[in-house]
């Protein structure tokens, strides 16, 4: 049974009561994305975040001026010092600057066991303003795909990872199959950049089944760091002992609820100051466990090799098969949503 997610005032060790997730990635000095956004998201979901820095970026909402990559030995030292007394239940990887960093992470993860942490790779390639963050060779990308448990690209990142154009539903599925063929255990593609979709439709593919998560498009401003937020929330819900399907559903709902909580207020402030919403990338507010039924996606389940078994689950039924143990958050079937 997982320890209660609370901190005793008498405790001298912060991590004795709160599960730990490591965030590997770049520092965004504006705080809108990167490991800063990861740590904020994890804290919001009652997880202690440890940060392993791959690079320092000088950026704002609109521009990246420069970046400085950490050498692989410095990244290795961060791993060593944390692993001694703060081992992770999960690892969320974001921007990796180069092959040396990536190979170090792969080697370290492959040697970690008893227990092995769940590893999420959000393959961040560039900033919202277009600055390049990752320069990885194809062979190293393949090594990462074979090492992590799930990779969470957006449409542009999926095209880069596979060297395939992703311009419609057919090419999307072809690219996902290419990633699976390269060794990816599971793939979650974020559909926010899929211009051909009427709604935003994310897709999860693993060896046994496919899930689609559909949400209405949100046109009321841009929110920075949503990719970081979703991957971190996924890691958090996995650590809180939700099965992968429920964890993805909750992570999707969390981002949707943060977006709905943040953008209307900040768009109103922007309008009051005559700032163009199209040019403003807003900073997310914290939200906690997603609880509004309207924040949850429509989830469509498809068992691979059994097309007649496809079924839809709406916001009031969700996914029944939660493996959540007693802890800080309830199983979906134990809430008014289940």
Q: Residue spans of the language-model regions?
A:
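Substrate-binding N-lobe of the ribokinase-like
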Residues: 3-90
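Phosphate-handling active-site elements
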Residues: 13, 46-50, 210-211, 237-252
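Charged C-terminal helix
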Residues: 18, 69, 245-338
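Short pre-catalytic strand/loop immediately N-terminal to key active-site residues, enriched for Gly-Thr
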Residues: 24-30, 211-225
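Short, small-residue alpha-helix embedded
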Residues: 39-41, 159-160, 220-244, 248
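Selective hydrophobic functional segments
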Residues: 63-108, 279-283, 288-293
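Glycine/small-residue-rich loop that forms an oxyanion/phosphate-binding "nest" at active or ligand-binding sites
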Residues: 88-143
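Conserved phosphate/ATP/ADP-binding segment of small-molecule kinases
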Residues: 131-210, 219
